[in-house]
Amino acid sequence: KFLEYYGFVGDEPMPLYSVAFEHIEFLKSGEKSRLIGKLFDLAKNAIWDADAPNYLQKAVIELILIFPDEILSLLKEEDNKIVESFWYFILYYPSLGAEYDLGYQKRYQQLYFCISEKDKLMGEVVKGIYNRIIVESR
């Protein structure tokens, strides 16, 4: 649904494409308990793309780093397929050679340490998805 409003299909922008960044910033300014759930729901089955999905990815990463317990609580309610889909979207990097990009590595390390400190098993899931993305980017 997210891309139906904020995405791009072929050469055509969707109705809210031009305001995607502002809308995500507005969402981030809301009440955190409601915001976490809404952004989590958007990210569960999201697929990375430039612009709006990228803005969403960055917003959710910020929330994970600030509210890891809340995100982990939501993830524990989901099945493994959704958990993997969520982390794949969060960790995805659209470039060959992701393993050599220091900014990407730093972001992964921040997420990994933040999550594994709270939940070792989920930290291993994060590590596994990261390694899969690295292999796929070669």
Write out the residue ranges for each language-model feature.
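Extended alpha-helical scaffolding segments
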Residues: 33-38, 44, 48-138
